[in-house]
């Protein structure tokens, strides 16, 4: 794409050089004179004006002029007054170095620039010097119909304002109304464009119906774009492209663009996008793409766009304290690293609140409030998405899933609240090595959808893990939840649950196994911390039954005791226990009856044998 832009720019230069051949470009560059360029005489010493009759171009080659002073030297066919302080321009104006044009409301309240369809080229104002537009209206105009140009397609020819290559001055546009400018042609024809320069101001304007609102590219720097109202653009509202840097975009309102509101492409650096209102744009409210670095997006109100904020192939950007409501995705990071998403309020997203996707790593997502997302509050997906930290976020009220982990590894979720989401709070697919800690679990549902996923839940101090539904969809023995410490775990429906206890206890209750029958057991894979006193209270047992607790270190015979039918297992060891099994050992009833019957028979036989022996003994005594 970068090469494509360069080729397009070179082609534009070629077109311009042909259009202005033997005119002001060559005059300015080489000091050559051509018959079609006429210098205007009888003007002040510090002002230089020329006219190119082939390209219909008024050339300001020195000094400072305004619209009425230009008109006084040319006939009405080029620049004419059509009403009180209202002017119609039917030519190009070119401002060279060391020259300036002032379009001021004091002398030109309205400037209409005609569209010339005869040679398929619009009229334009092109500056390589200084251009000041203040307190005026500049309108694209069709003098034949006496109305704005009818836009049939993006290529419909309309006038434009351009700060050209190697500009030595500034183009300041303030307190003005600019409308119906620009078209999809060559680089710089899009509406209001800066191809070079630094230190310009674009402040407190209303920009309506341009092909592109404002465009900066090719190392443009130190531009302030503030307090503008940009609407109904056929492309972007504000576009920064190709190594633009040190740009401030502050307190603007951009709405109803056909594409994106604000775009930063190809090595844009040190950009501040703050306090803007971005609404009802068909594309993305803010797009940072292809090595856009050190961009700060702060305190913006972003509402009802196809997407809120997207960062792609860029790093070291900050998204903070934004209000993001009713967008497709609230915030989307794709192949982005080391970005920070902090303290945003994201609500009513039609897809994901925050989507971290496709080889995005080392991002920090903290203290965001995410509510009422239709798909997932936070979605983390695709291989290579790893080592991200999610800290202190609130994810609640989603119509589907709260926190979705899809093919990711080694991410940390710390001190988050994931609650009151309709289907699952945690959804885990083909993901491992992810850690949840210091998080509140209350009526939390966790769904595993494949055999190799696991989730570590640790350091949930003073939190109650109760009433939760940990479900293994495919009923394998590989899915794990690791819990540490002080937890009450209920409804263990997976066969392989990991438990991390500490010096307090873990209460495992409501086990979904029948322990009253022989040869049935419950198995957990676990890791007990080294040199820590561990106390397990295992409930849901049958009073009076005998149980065997087997670990990789010891086998204990335990008798269930207490009114709650619990058994208690205390363990202290310097080595890790990684597995224990609980097995019911009570003898089945039919064996018990058989043994009792045999005992009764044996007793009867013994009784009769003893009785017979006694009689024999008595008879022997009588015979003596």
Which residues does each predicted region cover?
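Catalytic cores of secreted or luminal carbohydrate-active enzymes
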Residues: 456-507
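Beta-strand/loop edge motif enriched in small/polar residues
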Residues: 29-274, 278-326, 332, 340, ...
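Secretory targeting signatures
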Residues: 1-31, 176, 225, 249, ...
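C-terminal beta-strand-rich structural cap/linker in extracellular carbohydrate-active enzymes
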Residues: 562-585
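Short, well-ordered beta-strand segments enriched in hydrophobic/aromatic residues
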Residues: 508, 521-526
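Surface-exposed beta-strand/loop patches in extracellular or lumenal glycoproteins
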Residues: 527-544
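Solvent-exposed beta-strand/loop surfaces of large extracellular or lumenal domains
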Residues: 76-79, 553-566
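Predominantly extracellular beta-rich ligand-binding scaffolds that present long acidic/polar faces
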Residues: 382, 405, 412-466
